């Protein structure tokens, strides 16, 4: 499956989600453009946030992804899954609040996990756990959608005021081509993580999925309405199923 096929699958589900929840595409567009403008306006004082450096961050992440086994971490992850992946030399990309699992470990193991963490995929609602990633300068894959403007604005302000802000890659969920942003496909932070890894060239069957469940709201989910979240998780599972069905056997 090519990177563009991965994105196509993920984007089709985005369209279905908007229809299911009656969310206007224009709201997604407005949020994306506002995030882009906000980050661009701060790039004069944060050189790593310029459009050129954000492109370099994509290239750097892609190179690291292709340099060994990779695990995508979802909100229902448990400690045993993390330890097993760590022992088999996986690197990690965490989906939003799932990064909170790291605090469950003793300090030496915690440090090993942080050293293997490549990025955090977030729509900025995974507090308080995502703050730890910023403090560790973990690359943020920051997403804009129609109802998270306040969340991403708060996060951008918080990390822009840090002495050493993390590097950023910006994502959106519109069908438009937006210079300085990506739409790798996917809807929740969890399936967007998988789509991103696949879009950057890792074959879908080679991605280890930790903590991906659609029957429960995971322990590490951000602030959310449980009933609504379960409806969203159905679409996450659809993305995963379609990616696996389309992957070469």
Where does each model-flagged region fall?
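Extended interaction regions within the primary functional domain
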Residues: 112, 130, 161-162, 181-184, ...
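N-terminal donor/sugar-recognition subdomains of glycan-related enzymes
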Residues: 1-70, 80-83, 217-249
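Charged/polar interaction segments and conserved charged motifs
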Residues: 1-5, 91-118, 226, 233-241, ...
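Short, surface-exposed, charge-dense and proline/glycine-enriched linear segments
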Residues: 85-87, 133-134, 199-204, 238-245
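Acidic/Gly/His-enriched mid-domain segments of enzyme catalytic cores or analogous surface patches
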Residues: 49, 56, 64-67, 90-91, ...
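A structural signal for short, well-ordered beta-strand segments and their strand-loop junctions
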Residues: 169-170, 206-211, 249
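Glycine-rich anion-binding loop/nest that anchors nucleotide
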Residues: 71-77, 96, 182-192, 204-220
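Glycine-rich beta-alpha loop segments
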Residues: 83-88, 95
